[in-house]
Structure formats: C-alpha cells, structure tokens
C-alpha cells in the first residue's frame, strides 16, 4: 500500500529539545492548545522536511517514508514523498492533484471536501480551525506539548489527530484511522512564514500521464 494522503498534508528528524527538557515536569511546558492556536494564527506559510511511519492496529511498523512539504493558507500545499516511492500531492486552492510517477498516473479531486476535514486542513486550511475540529489539550510527553483534534464531520478517513508542539512550532503529527492504524509524522527544519514561490502550488500533468478526475457532484 502506498503512503497515505496526508495534508494535508500532512520527514527527516523530529526536532527535540536538549536532554534536560525531557526531565522537566509537564507543568513547565506551555499549554499545548494555546501553542497550536498561536501557531495556526501566526503561520501563513511554511516549509519543512518530514519522516513518516505507518503502524498497523497491533502497533507494528509496516511502512516508512520521507519527504518535504510546503503550504500557504488558505488551501494551498505541496506534499512530496521522496522515499521509498515518489509521490506528489498538490493543492492549488481549487483542485487536489495526486501524481504517482511509477504508475504514470495523476488523480484529480475537488479541493472542497477533499481536505476540509482532513489533516491537511490543520496545516493549510482556513484560520477558523475550530469550525472543522474539536480541539483539546492532550498533555506533554517526549518534550512536546500535545493537542488532540477530532473532526466534526462524520465521513472522514480518520478518527483523530494528535499534534506535538515544541514552543509555538509544530514538531509532530499523529493520525489515528478508523481501523486502529496509526501514522506518525515527525517534522524538522520547519520554517514558518518563509517565502514560498506561487509556482509551488501549480501542477501540470506530465505528457502521456493517465489523468483520472473525480466527476462533479450532481445538482438537485
């Protein structure tokens, strides 16, 4: 099975603090929810590297992947898997493009509904994140303050998402799906509000690629 689509989005190495930080009591860390809301409000663009691990319901690691991501609010992102298989996901604000070079295939979905209640919305979605997710503090561990986000919509492919913050910077994301599986993303070299080229969110299918586009919803 290929790497799951995660805006998102949503990875090199998780940015951890010095060893002393791991020894400090949880009370020393700032409120995770406050930190996430501050990050969400202040960060309009970002770039980072990521490492991804996929675990089955028994907790066994079944897949690893790595790559980079870029986003610009609202609704634009580029999520690139470099290893073990090349895959590119581009959200241009209107459409979501998923390119699988090995299959010479491009899948096109409407952005509306594709990321509105998915992990991508936590990174590249609109500022009013509480309209899409129920958020709550989830304690501190591994030197990070955690927030749990549960989608308000019922038809998402995941049950909840945990976000790990170090200060007001996102360091990790953990997705729990409906079947008991778990996907852990660890971020590094995250640059908030870095200049991002508009071309990053433009995708043109390669010549000769098989393009599969979702049919628009019927009216009425």
Feature map (PLM): residue ranges:
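N-terminal secretory signal peptides that target proteins for export/translocation
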Residues: 1-13
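Bacterial N-terminal signal peptides
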Residues: 15-27
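Solvent-exposed strand-loop boundary residues in beta-sheet-rich modules
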Residues: 58, 102-104, 179
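Gly/Pro-enriched, hydrophobic low-complexity segments
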Residues: 107, 130-218
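Soluble periplasmic/extracytoplasmic beta-strand elements of cell-envelope proteins
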Residues: 47-51, 68-70, 78-80, 88-90, ...
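N-terminal leader/targeting segments and the immediate start of mature chains
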Residues: 2, 26-62, 205-220
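An acidic-aromatic
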Residues: 66-118, 183
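Short, solvent-exposed helix-to-loop capping segments enriched in aromatics
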Residues: 40, 115-130
């Amino acid at each position: 099975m290929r790497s799951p689509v995660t805006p998102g989005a949503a990875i090199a190495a998780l940015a951890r603090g010095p060893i002393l930080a791991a020894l400090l009591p949880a009370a020393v860390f700032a409120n995770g929810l406050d930190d996430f809301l501050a990050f969400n409000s202040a960060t309009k663009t970002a770039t980072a590297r990521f490492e991804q691990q996929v675990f089955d319901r028994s907790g066994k690691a079944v897949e690893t992947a790595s790559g980079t991501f870029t986003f610009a609010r609202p609704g634009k992102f580029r999520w690139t898997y470099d290893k073990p298989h090349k895959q590119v996901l581009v959200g241009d604000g209107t459409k979501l493009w998923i390119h699988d070079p090995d299959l010479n295939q491009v899948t096109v979905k409407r952005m509306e509904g594709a990321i509105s209640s998915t992990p991508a919305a936590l990174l590249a979605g609109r500022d009013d994140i509480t309209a899409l997710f129920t958020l709550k503090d989830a304690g501190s561990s591994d030197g990070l303050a955690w927030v749990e986000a549960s989608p308000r919509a019922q038809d998402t492919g995941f049950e909840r998402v945990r976000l790990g913050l170090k200060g007001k910077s996102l360091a990790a994301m953990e997705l729990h799906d409906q079947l008991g599986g778990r996907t852990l993303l660890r971020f590094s070299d995250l640059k908030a509000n870095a200049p991002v080229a508009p071309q990053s969110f433009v995708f043109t299918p390669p010549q000769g690629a098989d393009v599969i586009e979702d049919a628009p919803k019927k009216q009425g």
